[in-house]
Amino acid sequence: MTSDKDINDKLKTSKILWYMYWGFILASIVLIIQIIHLKVFWEPRPTTEHYFRPRNRKEILKPERGAILDHNGKLIAVSTPMYNIAIDCTVMKESYARDKKEGKQKEKEWKEKACRLAQELPAVLAKDGKDAAYYRKLILDGRSQNKQYVPITKGINHNTLVKLKTLPLFNQDKNTGGLIVERMDTRQYPYKSLARSVVGYVRNNEDTGVSKRRGIESKYDQTLHGTEGLRWKRITDNKGTIQDTDSAMVAVVNGNDVRTTLDIDIQDIADRALRRQIESEMDIDGGCVIIMDVKTGAIRAMVNLNRGSNGTLDETYNLAIARAGEPGSVMKTATLMTLLEDGLIRLDDEIETNHGKMKNVKDDETIKKYERNNKTDKIPVIDGFKLSSNYVFRYLVKEHYGKKPEEYLARLYEYKLADAFDFELEGFAKATLPDTKSKTWSPTDLIQVAIGYSATETPLHIVTFYNAIANKGKMMKPYLVESIEKEGDIIERFKPEILNGAICSKATADTLLRALKTVTSEGTGTKVKNARCKVAGKTGTAWVVMDPKYTEGRGGVYKDSNGRKQYQGTFVGFFPADEPKYSAIITIWSKPTLQSFHGGTLPALAMKEIVDNTYALDCEWGEEIEKKGRIPEMEAEEIYTDNEKGSPVPSVTGYGLKDALYAIENSGYRCVYEGWGHVVRQSPKAGTPLTKGQTVKIILR
C-alpha cells in the first residue's frame, strides 16, 4: 500500500508541475504579444533609432545630360567629366605615431614625398600659376594641422588627372597617399559662343540659374536632363561603403539628345559675315541673320550679335525672334503680291510720277531723281519696286484699296504677318498689323503699311514670308529641332509643317521672282550682284521708334533732341534665285546716330559673303570647291586621354555617336565621323596601335 507520505509527495509534485505548466503558458503568451507589438506597433525613438537600424546611406545617382547636335550630327553641346583634386593630409599619421620603432622615419619619408609632389605640381597644373613653394607649404601645413581635406586644384580634365596619378604620393592608394578625386559633369561647347542665343548655356546638369532660362538648353531641359537614380550603400566597420543588396535600387536614366536643324558650318559662315560688316562700325548696336531651308522651313543658321558696353559683339539676346519693329521697304513685296494676286496691276504697268508728291506725306526724292534721269513723268511698277519708291506703293494701295482697306489687310493676315508661330524658343515677340475696326485706325495707316510702317514684324516673320515666295507660294513653318534621340536611335521626329499651302499662285510667285531679281541686278540690292550664284531679294530701311525720353518735345517719335535717328536695315532674299535652296535675312540696328544705314549696304554685303561661302560649302550647286568655312574644334586640353604612344584603338562598333566620341577621345585620338545612328565601321581597326593625336574615322548608320 502507498503510504500517506508518498501520496503527499505526488500531490506536491503534481502541483508544482501544474504551476510550471501555466507559468510557461503565460510566459509564451506574453512573449507572443511582445513579438507582435515589436513587429507591428513599436517604433524606436528618433534619438535611439540608429541603434536599431543597419548603418546605411542613400546615394543619389546623377544622370548624364543629353547632347545637343547640329543637323549633321556634330556636337554643339555635350557633358564631359571634369575633376576637383584635394589631398587628405592625415593619412597614416596616427599609424606612424603608434609605431615606436620606424614611425619617425616613415613620417619623414612621407613628408619628403610631399615635397617632391610639390616640386612637380607646377608643371602639371601650369594653368593655376602656382609655384612649388606654394604647394609645399599648403601640404605640410595641412599635415601639421591634421586637415583631412586640402584643395589642390579644380576643373581638370582626364588627361591631367592621369598625369597627377604618376606623381609621388598620388601614385599610391588613397589610404596611404591621400589623393581625393571628385568627379563632376560639366557642359562643354566645342564651338564656344557660336549660336549661343539659340543653344543656351548651362554650367552642368544641376544648373538652375537664370543663365539656363533661354535657348534649347532651357526649352528642352527636361528632355536633356534625364531622371535621377537611387541606391543604398551600407557603411562597413572601417567606415567604407558597400552596395546594400537588400535595399531597392532605382536605375538612373540619362538624358536624351536633341538634334537641331542648325548646320554649324553655315552658322559659322553667317556669324563671320555679319561680324565682318558691323564689328568696326561702332554706331551699329546689333544684328541678326536667319538662314532657312526653302523646302522644309528648317532653320540652318540663326545668328544674333549684340554690342556690349565694352564694344564687343556677343550672342546675349535673340534679336531674330524677340525684336519686333517696323520692317520698312521689305514689306513692299507683300504689297506687290497682293496687287498681283487681285489682278489689279502688272509689273510693266506705268503710273504718273507727279513729282513724288502725295497729300500729308513727304515728297519722294527717288521719284524726282527718276524723272530727271529718264526725262519722263511716268514710271513702271517694276522700276518703282527695284528703286524702292515709297510714292509708287503708297499710290497703288491708295488707288486700289483706299475704299476697302480691310481687303488689303486681310491679305497680309493670310501671309501670316501677324501670326504667333508655335516656335521652339521662348521670347517670341508679337507681330502686329493695324485693324480698321480699332479706335486708333487712320486712313494714313493704309499707305504706311504698304511701305513697312504702322506694322511691327520680327525678322523671322519676314524671312518666312520670303521663303514662301521661293517655295512657289507654299509657306512652311520655321522650326529648329529635328528629332529627340537616344544613343543614335530616334525617339521622336519633328517633320516639316505647312502654315499656308498657297499664299499666292505659282504665276504670282514667278512674277515676284522676276521683280526681286531686278532689285539685285539693277536696283537697291546691287551689292549682291556679283555673288557666286544669282540672288533674288529686297532691301529695306526703317527708322526705329525711339524711347520717348529722347524724343520729348520734338513732335515725333523717330528723332531725338540732337537730331539723331536709329535705323533698321534689312536685306532678305533667297538663293540660287532660279532654284532656291536657302532663304536668308540679315537685319542690323543702329544706335542713335547722325549717320544713315540702309539695307542695301552692310546687310547686302553680309548676304553676298554668306552666299559665296555657302555656295562653296555645297557641292550640289556645281563643281567641288574647297570649303572656306572654318570649322572650330575643341581645344587640345579638352580632349581626354589616358594613353601614351602606341596604345591600341578602342573598339566602338555598335556604339552611339556620343559614346564612340568619348571612347576614342578618351584614348587620346581625334575622331571624324560620317552619318548618324550606330557605328558600323571604324578605321583603323580596333587594337591598332597609334600615336596620340592621330585620327580615327567612324561610319554610322
Predicted regions and their residues:
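Ligand-recognition elements built from short beta-strands and adjacent flexible loops
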Residues: 532, 586-590, 595-601, 606-701
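Beta-lactam-recognizing serine transpeptidase/beta-lactamase-like catalytic domain environment
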Residues: 2-4, 77, 236-249, 262, ...
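Residue-level detector of short coil/turn "hinge" positions at structural boundaries
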Residues: 132, 171, 346-347, 419, ...
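Periplasmic/cell-envelope proteins involved in peptidoglycan metabolism and beta-lactam response
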Residues: 1-312, 407-414, 529-531, 589, ...
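Extracytoplasmic
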Residues: 61-64, 71, 78-84, 147, ...
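Preference for bulky hydrophobic residues occupying beta-strand positions
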Residues: 85-87, 200, 260, 323, ...
